[in-house]
């Protein structure tokens, strides 16, 4: 229903194109199996994070293998080119030109500590300072869906631990992700 509402809007935004893009990303993201990162979840750390309201990743960063991460990005990029809805030659050429080797190991390490900061740094490393908005949207989809591979199990485990806590309150307190701290 919400999508139908957006499609009817006349605000100059290509909502149909954005919906098609998002759907094509969903179609290809499952080409990457969810990673079972060794030792990525610790119940004691989770309980400490929840109790102290500190993001889990602050206490125990997720260890991501940089070479594997770059391969995952390339695999998803290739699948997106093959199956995605981007079909304008200039945009396909830009997508093919992305070089994941520009991502430093330190930046990939940052993905396991602070995914929001990682996105900002990674975008600049891969696209440079003069990145156009279309490519920023494309790279966001690629980066976020590869991160999903690494964070999905951890996020589910944290949600399970959070469900055990009986501190339900209502009010105007800001919500943050218990795993990474991003605003919810």
List the predicted regions and their residue ranges.
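Cys/His-rich short segments
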Residues: 160-184
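N-terminal alpha-helical interaction blocks
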Residues: 5-162
